């Protein structure tokens, strides 16, 4: 099999290895949130969002988002409030406990980001980010959902 036929496999394995490592590092530091929960809490840090918007930004289905938010709510890290703009929906908001958890997790996440970059030049990192953004753009249905890798 030519090496370029393994790109999907390599991307999938890299993502799986990275998430496994991040989860291990978070747990080792005593943080009880998962990488997926951290993603939601990062988004909620600045403002509340609806389930639909969280799903769209994180590129996961609504049922997965609901499960994540349910667990965050059960842990006291987030809560639902009525959406003043649309009474049929709720805004998910971070709690003070959630802010403390994500602030603590951020230290570990930053450390893992540094681990990813170690051994690569700034130029290589920039090229890598451009490639990842290009792959994302190529396969998304619309650019309104795009979250650039910065």
Stretches found by the model and what they are:
Residues 20-64:
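N-terminal helix-turn-helix DNA-binding core of bacterial DNA-binding proteins
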Residues 15, 42-46, 106:
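Short, locally clustered residues in the helix-turn-helix/winged-helix DNA-binding domain
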Residues 1, 123-150:
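C-terminal regulatory/oligomerization modules of transcriptional regulators
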Residues 1-29:
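N-terminal leader segment of winged-helix/HTH proteins
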Residues 19, 70-130:
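Charged, amphipathic alpha-helical coiled-coil/dimerization segments
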């Amino acid at each position: 099999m030519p090496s370029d036929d393994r790109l999907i496999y390599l991307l999938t394995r890299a993502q799986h290895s990275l998430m496994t490592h991040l989860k291990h590092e978070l747990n080792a530091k005593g943080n009880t949130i998962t990488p997926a929960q951290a993603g939601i809490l990062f988004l909620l840090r600045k403002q509340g969002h609806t389930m639909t918007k969280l799903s769209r930004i994180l590129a996961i289905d609504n049922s997965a988002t609901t499960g994540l938010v349910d667990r965050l709510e059960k842990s006291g890290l987030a809560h639902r409030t009525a959406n003043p703009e649309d009474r049929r929906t709720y805004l998910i908001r971070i709690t003070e406990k959630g802010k403390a958890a994500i602030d603590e997790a951020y230290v570990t996440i930053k450390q893992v980001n540094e681990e990813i970059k170690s051994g690569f030049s700034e130029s290589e990192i920039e090229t890598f980010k451009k490639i990842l953004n290009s792959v994302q753009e190529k396969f998304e249905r619309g650019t309104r959902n795009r979250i650039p890798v910065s």
